Regions:
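Conserved ABC ATPase "signature" region
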Residues: 189-207, 441-458
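Hydrophobic anchor residue at the start of the ABC signature
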Residues: 223-224, 252, 476, 504
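Conserved ABC ATPase signature
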Residues: 210-214, 462-466, 470
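Helical segment within the ABC ATPase nucleotide-binding domain
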Residues: 249-263, 501-515
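Pre-NBD coupling/linker segments of ABC/ABC-like ATPases
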Residues: 2-16, 20-27, 35-46, 53, ...
Length: 602
């Protein structure tokens, strides 16, 4: 067995602890050669993997949960691709891009997806685990002899592959790029496709705006357009659907297929929205392992089979269990039974609201929401979804109509999360302020919100030090920990990987069912909405001008209405029950359109 010891440099704080990892280590106490010691600069602990016996005492004793130790099969070391440094993340295997098809990559955050993209795009040279004495390209290529990666890496080393990457974190572009969208895109255009891309991605309205003024979704589309403008033979897209609504996600997916030209080029997409990844990819690889500790790239699977294996939590080609629970989508059963013999928490008549400043108008027909229900809200950005919740909470007053049953308390998780939305300095203090029960390890609320969402190792961290995904999970936990009649969660899946999205969906359902309250969830990931929602409200209209909503509908009716507006047909996978987008013009697409069924449940 190979022992992998990782010390998280962000968590390890020797100056703030009693060095429990060193003091309690049985090897340190019984042998001359230490297994754990302080680094020379005393900034962190160092674990010597060849001496460590893997007892796990340091893992349990560390007050900051900074240490991880795992044992891996010896065979994995033969396919070690990269290690960042001493007691740092290890990557095994690499996804294999192929011309003629689009490669999709699925996996948890911290499992090596972005590292793989950096290597495949030439930003990072693999060191085969020898971080202190990195090998030359010839040795790296020899280690992949007999595989398709040998050819790819040979081209990469000889500069025959010119790669361009759409990064995962797009906020940095706002600070780095100066000028208008029009000027930047014309400057980036190496293929003469400027006009076609502007039309395909629907960005005409933002051409004269400065990069610094763009919203998250607008910035995302600008960067995708800039990447597709480049005359290269390898395109990499790291989470291209973040910040985008359903219509824009489909628009981006179609643009990537059309302009990246996968028939001649290498195209790789990392995406957590499995419905979009299924639509765009020809085959997938699954990144699994222990986040932040090690990651392994699976063998390639066809898209449908690979995603289903991922949802099952078992990879047959590797004989590897990657999750204990299987994810199944059973939409119709819950949708039909929801709300029976329950009391109403919300009710409203036909209401209308107009903003005095912008003249934006929202029209909502009568509706009623019962205890124990999760209401999914779907529709474009800027169409009135947040205005609707402000009307329900009493923050805004309708111009006509009335809220017939008003909730006593509404708690809101906003769309954009930042440290400024938290009132306390640390994660623990914010959770404790929301509810004393949520920080009690013996309570069900702690199990659901802290353990299930893996916030327990973040408790002592400062809010300002959290990543986007960590802050998102803390914001969700703080919202759901509070006592309220209605929980409003605006895009809770942003920054989260597939595993975390599933965990959040289960937590929302559990809290709502246990407390007999209501949750209203605005979410653009249709698969997540299908998983979590009892009823669905659909918003449509013209952004910033007029929004029209439906009443809360059965999931089948709601999704059918949304997809009809999007002009897309969707079927359910017979094995997993997950929604899958039909290819335009396919037999199923034509049959469903003829029947008027844009979403088929059975």
């Amino acid at each position: 067995m190979v022992r992998v010891a990782v010390v998280d440099r962000d968590y390890c704080k020797p100056s703030k602890c009693n060095l429990e990892c060193i003091r309690f280590c049985p090897v340190n106490r019984s042998r001359k050669k230490k297994a754990v010691d302080l680094a020379e600069d005393k900034s962190r602990a160092v674990i010597f993997e060849d001496v460590c016996i893997g007892c796990g005492i340091c893992v349990k004793k560390c007050p900051f949960s900074a240490i991880s130790i795992v044992n891996l099969p010896d065979e994995l070391e033969k396919v070690l691709v990269h290690r960042y440094g001493e007691n740092m993340f290890k990557l095994y295997n690499l996804p294999t891009p192929k011309t003629g098809s689009i490669l999709g990559i699925i996996g948890r955050n911290g499992s090596g997806k972005s590292t793989s993209i950096k290597i495949l795009s030439g930003q990072l040279k693999p060191n085969l685990g020898r971080y202190s004495n990195p090998p030359e390209w010839d040795e790296v290529i020899r280690s992949f002899r007999g595989t398709e990666l040998q050819t790819y890496l040979s081209k990469l080393a000889n500069n025959e592959i010119k790669a361009v990457v759409k990064p995962q974190y797009i906020e940095l572009a706002r600070k780095a790029l100066k000028g208008t969208v029009r000027d930047m895109l014309k400057k980036a255009d190496e293929r003469g496709v400027y006009s076609d891309l502007v039309k395909a991605l629907n960005i005409e309205r933002i051409l004269d705006r400065s990069i610094s003024e763009l919203s998250g979704g607008e910035l995302q589309k600008f960067l995708i357009a800039a990447v597709l403008s480049k005359n290269t033979n390898a395109y990499f897209f790291d989470e291209p659907c973040s910040y985008l609504d359903v219509r824009e996600r489909l628009r981006v997916a179609r643009s990537i297929v059309e302009f990246a030209n996968p028939a001649r080029n290498y195209v790789v997409v990392v995406e957590h929205d499995l419905m979009i990844l299924d639509y765009i990819s020809d085959y997938v690889v699954i990144m699994y392992g222990e986040p932040g500790v090690y990651g392994v790239s699976s063998k390639p699977y066809s898209t449908r089979v690979g995603i289903n294996h991922y949802l099952k939590g078992y990879l047959p080609a590797e004989n590897m269990l990657i999750r204990e629970e299987e994810v199944k989508f059973k939409i119709s059963a819950r949708g039909e039974s929801a709300g029976k013999q329950e009391f109403p928490i919300l009710a409203w008549s036909n209401i209308e609201y107009t903003y005095p400043s912008s003249k934006f108008r929202l029209i909502v027909p009568p509706g009623r929401v019962h205890s124990g229900e999760v209401i999914g809200v779907l529709g474009p950005n800027g169409i009135g979804k947040t205005t609707f919740i402000k009307l329900l909470s009493g923050e805004l007053k309708p111009v006509s109509g009335d809220i017939l049953i008003k909730p006593e308390r509404v708690v809101i998780k906003p769309q954009e999360v930042s440290p400024s939305i938290m009132s306390e300095e640390t994660v623990l203090a914010n959770l404790k302020k929301a509810s004393q029960l949520v920080v009690d390890p013996t309570s069900w609320l702690y199990v659901e919100l802290v353990k299930r969402m893996r916030i327990n190792r973040l408790l002592e961290r400062n809010i300002s030090d959290l990543s986007g995904g960590e802050l998102q999970k803390v914001a969700i936990a703080v919202t759901l920990a509070q006592e309220a009649d209605v929980y409003f969660l605006d895009e809770p899946s942003a920054y989260l990987d597939v595993e975390e999205r599933i965990a959040v969906a289960r937590v929302i359902r559990r809290i709502v069912e246990e407390r007999r309250k209501t949750a209203i969830v605005v979410e653009h990931d249709l698969m997540l909405q299908a998983f979590v929602s009892d009823k669905i409200m659909v918003f449509w209209g013209e952004p910033a001008v007029e929004g029209v909503a439906s009443s809360p509908l059965d999931p089948r009716e709601g999704l059918n209405l949304l997809l009809k507006n999007l002009d897309v047909t969707v079927r359910r996978d017979p094995e997993s029950g997950r929604p899958r987008i039909n290819k335009p013009g396919s037999v199923l697409d034509r049959e469903q359109r003829q029947r008027g069924l844009y979403y088929i449940v059975d």
